[in-house]
């Protein structure tokens, strides 16, 4: 289900003196935002996409990188909200959304095209207060229920890792927190920035030591727009080198990330 999140209050305009440079900028905008508006897919509850700070202001990797890119292109931005990232990937594949930031998996690369990595993020497990599960080795036991986001990397990967524990899909992060309260799951598996965000809402909850893998976050665009990838790769490199990416992480409270390797 998609919900229009409204257009940003600004329309960023780039003023370029040379006609050739202006035409080049227009060409870049048409590559990434052929409708004239950059449609950015976001989902609430994860700093890698969008969260809201104490003042009610939205932040997040997809949210803020999308805003910075729209400003660079000189086009308005439309944030389109979904319940989970799998729905955004489908919308990008179908041409309903222009981009998002998500884990660049081989499976998703069959549906969308990716920029160079933006960040690397550890994957982990969250357990509630007073959980008998104290380490990863305690998980694969009869009766243990592992929550994952429906359509996520965790849902596809963990069934091959755990032979005894049960995988329980949740519609969203918000739903998963409620599932903890009802005893429907014993732990939750996803990227650590999301787990930290969840733990802030669950007194006494903790993230287990170690990790079970890593996500490589990148900008995803529809297939057929590969001509835009050099522009996106330059944009990513500039956001990394200028410190802008560090600021985005701090504003979103994004924890559990490391620098991305570049091919």
Q: For each of these PLM feature ranges, what is it?
A:
Residues 26-28, 153-170, 207-208, 237-263:
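Ligand-binding clefts/hinges and TM-proximal coupling segments of bilobed small-molecule sensing domains
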Residues 67, 71, 76-140, 204-212:
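Acidic, polar ligand-binding/catalytic clefts
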Residues 44, 119-130, 192, 196-237, ...:
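Periplasmic-binding protein-like
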Residues 1-10:
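Bacterial N-terminal signal peptides that target proteins for export
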Residues 69, 92-93, 139, 179-181, ...:
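Hydrophobic residues within well-ordered alpha-helices
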Residues 37-44, 59, 137-152, 166:
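Short loop->beta-strand "edge-of-pocket" segments that line small-molecule binding or catalytic clefts
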Residues 41-46, 81-85, 95-107, 129, ...:
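Beta->alpha turn/N-cap motifs
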């Amino acid at each position: 289900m998609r919900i229009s999140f409204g257009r940003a209050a600004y329309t960023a305009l780039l003023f370029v003196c040379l006609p050739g440079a202006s035409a080049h900028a227009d060409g870049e905008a048409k590559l990434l935002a052929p409708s004239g508006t950059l449609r950015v897919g976001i989902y609430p509850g994860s700093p890698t996409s969008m969260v809201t700070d104490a003042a009610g202001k939205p932040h997040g990797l997809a949210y803020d990188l999308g805003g910075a890119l729209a400003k660079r292109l000189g086009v308005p931005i439309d944030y389109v909200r979904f319940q989970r990232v799998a729905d955004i990937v489908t919308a990008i594949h179908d041409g309903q959304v222009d981009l998002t930031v998500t884990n660049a998996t081989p499976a998703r690369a069959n549906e969308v095209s990716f920029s160079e990595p933006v960040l690397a993020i550890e994957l982990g497990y969250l357990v509630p207060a007073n959980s008998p599960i104290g380490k990863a080795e305690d998980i694969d036991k009869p009766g243990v229920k592992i929550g994952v986001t429906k359509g996520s990397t965790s849902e596809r990967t963990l069934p091959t890792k755990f032979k005894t524990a049960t995988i329980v899909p949740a519609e969203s992060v918000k739903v998963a927190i409620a599932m903890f309260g009802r005893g429907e799951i014993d732990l939750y598996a996803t990227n650590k920035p999301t787990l930290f965000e969840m733990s802030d809402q669950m007194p006494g909850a903790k993230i287990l030591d170690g990790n079970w893998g890593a996500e490589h976050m990148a900008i995803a665009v529809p297939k057929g727009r590969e001509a835009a990838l050099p522009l996106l790769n330059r944009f990513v490199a500039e956001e990394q080198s200028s410190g802008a990416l560090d600021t985005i992480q701090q504003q979103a409270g994004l924890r559990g990330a490391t620098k991305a390797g570049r091919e």
